[in-house]
Amino acid sequence: MLIILKENITTLGKLGEVVKVKPGYARNFLFPQKKAMKATKENLIKLEEQRLLLEEENTKKLNAAKVLASSLHDKFIILIKQASEDGKIFGSVTTREIAKTLLQEGYDISHHSLSLGGISIKNLGEYQVNIELHSKVIVPITIYVVRSEKDAHELRQAKLQNQKSEQQEAEQDASKEAADADDS
């Protein structure tokens, strides 16, 4: 099926391009998400008329994604899962579960935007997850899968302590640089 892209999609192409995709992908994902439309003569003419508007809308989405990306910088999520003695969790962690946790923390991100990088999270530990906020904005976040609330609390405290010490080091470095600049 030939479609016209209404926004940049990393795996398909850029805004306004006519691409061929499987009908189910278009019908079940691209059309409902308003990321594409059927490639007809009428739609091609309509697209040319609306190209500036769509590009402006895409720029707004990009800017919003950059703002959200800055708030997600150095973000980590702690998930508590039941696990066996050797660290294998019962079930697995899914993108839906991660999206639900992000929503609870105030970030409305679709599970379609999350990428586990081809791995399945079936053990306790630390994992890197990428969030595609826009085709040009991909933000990595860290997921920690722990066994208990106590482990989660200890991990949270350790992360906060690390962030405080890094911030203090950065402030000290900045003050040293300022002092060195004053001496020059």
Curated annotation (Swiss-Prot):
Pfam families the record matches: Ribosomal_L9_C, Ribosomal_L9_N
GO MF annotations, alphabetized: rRNA binding; structural constituent of ribosome
Biased composition (Basic and acidic residues): 173-184
InterPro entries associated with the record: Ribosomal_bL9, Ribosomal_bL9/RNase_H1_N, Ribosomal_bL9_bac/chp, Ribosomal_bL9_C, Ribosomal_bL9_C_sf, Ribosomal_bL9_N, Ribosomal_bL9_N_sf
Presence of the UniProt keyword Ribonucleoprotein in the record: yes
Any single GO BP term: translation
PROSITE patterns: RIBOSOMAL_L9
Tree of life domain: Bacteria
Keyword terms: Ribonucleoprotein, Ribosomal protein, RNA-binding, rRNA-binding
Gene Ontology terms: cellular component: ribonucleoprotein complex; ribosome
Disordered, as annotated region: 156-184
Residue ranges the record marks as coiled coil: none
Keyword RNA-binding among record annotations: yes
Family: Belongs to the bacterial ribosomal protein bL9 family.
Main function: Binds to the 23S rRNA.
Protein name: Large ribosomal subunit protein bL9
Origin species: Wolbachia pipientis subsp. Culex pipiens (strain wPip)
Lineage, top ranks: Bacteria, Pseudomonadati, Pseudomonadota, Alphaproteobacteria, Rickettsiales
